[in-house]
């Protein structure tokens, strides 16, 4: 219901703005949200998490494309590189019966949220292996930085700021 109301043009900006202000005041911006039957630990102040919470069909065309390609090519493995909160991993685990998913997330905060969601979704967690590091074509250590927006570090949109640390 909230996702339908939130799509109305006048409310599309107003609802998130009001919710952010209220949640900052009461300090309850994090928690479990049921996203089409998947319990995800999300933070309403994080822009990607907020999109997932408010708009039921977050990145639906992209996910449908991936699912159709996995089925068409009869793939057994899916690599979710830069998995963030695990949304893609969970959606694919839910739709593809015999898939093995390897999810990689170097950001400690995003990894934490994904880990908590895995614990709540035992029916899907046996398909997903989560690792707390990034992937590259080189064996190297890199320093990453999250983008800061409105005083809040976003878990999506991190960038490498220093090579060979």
Question: What is each of the regions a protein language model found here?
Answer:
Residues 55-137:
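SAM cofactor-binding core of SAM-dependent methyltransferases
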Residues 30-34, 83, 141-143:
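Ser/Thr- (and often Asn-) enriched beta-sheet segments in non-cytosolic proteins
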Residues 1-42:
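Membrane-proximal basic amphipathic "stem/tether" segments
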Residues 9, 41-46, 69, 94-95:
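A short alpha-helix capping/helix-coil boundary motif
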Residues 36-64, 122, 126, 131-165:
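Glycine-rich adenosyl-binding loop in Rossmann-like folds that engage adenosine-containing cofactors
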């Amino acid at each position: 219901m909230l996702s339908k109301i939130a799509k109305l043009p006048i409310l599309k900006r107003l609802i998130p703005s009001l919710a952010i202000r209220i949640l900052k005041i009461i300090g309850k911006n994090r928690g479990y949200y049921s996203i089409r039957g998947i319990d995800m630990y999300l933070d309403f102040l994080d822009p990607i998490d907020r999109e997932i919470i408010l708009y039921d069909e977050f990145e639906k065309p992209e996910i449908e494309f991936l699912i159709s390609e996995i089925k068409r090519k009869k793939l057994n493995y899916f690599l979710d590189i830069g998995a963030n909160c695990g949304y893609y991993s969970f959606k694919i685990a839910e739709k593809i019966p015999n898939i093995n998913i390897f999810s990689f997330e170097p950001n400690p905060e995003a990894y934490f949220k994904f880990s908590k969601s895995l614990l709540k979704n035992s029916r899907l967690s046996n398909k997903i292996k989560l690792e707390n590091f990034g992937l590259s074509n080189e064996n190297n250590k890199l320093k990453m930085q999250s983008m800061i927006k409105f005083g809040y570090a976003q878990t999506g949109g991190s960038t490498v700021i220093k090579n060979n640390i």
